Amino acid sequence: IMTRDKFFETIDKKVGLENREQIEWAYALAKQFHREQMRDEGVRYFEHCRDVALVLIKYGPTNPDELIVGLLHDIYEDQFVPRGMIKQLFGNEVNEALKTLSHEKPFYKRHGKIVKTSESKKEYFDLIRQSSVLVRRVKLADRLHNVLTLEFCKPEKRIRKIKETREYVLPIARETDMRFFKAIKNRCDYWDRKDHGK
């Protein structure tokens, strides 16, 4: 079982101590903001956030900002985050990366009101494809972890996710990092054989 201590031992060994405090903040924030969410496989949603950071380490080299974005990649989409908080804690690059990765973007109105707007799937993935390597790598780590854990979701959701992955994510992976491309494609092929006998 991956505990907090083991996670940070891995960080110290593979990434070093640079910005360690900020990574700890991101870890705590992800745990707090996602505390009531569960995944299809019956585990805390936070486990997915932590696993995305571990995938980024495995497919390194990585850096503190990338790990922070990995830990917090769903924070704007799933939660209502106070205006300016992420930018204040982690800087503008991390904040903008998190907004790009969110399918539902926060729009801050007066008196603390937050409205969420979303774009089409194609617009969303086009934006990611044109973004920084950091944004693309976090999306690829997120999707790789998702396709590795698809046995716990309903077949129709799985088939939809694999189709979306082939259409939108694999082209990004091919342009970004062939290791991600091969790992994600292998898992898509596995599920196609399982679900369609291909």
Predicted feature residues:
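Active-site helical microenvironments for divalent-metal-assisted chemistry
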Residues: 1-198
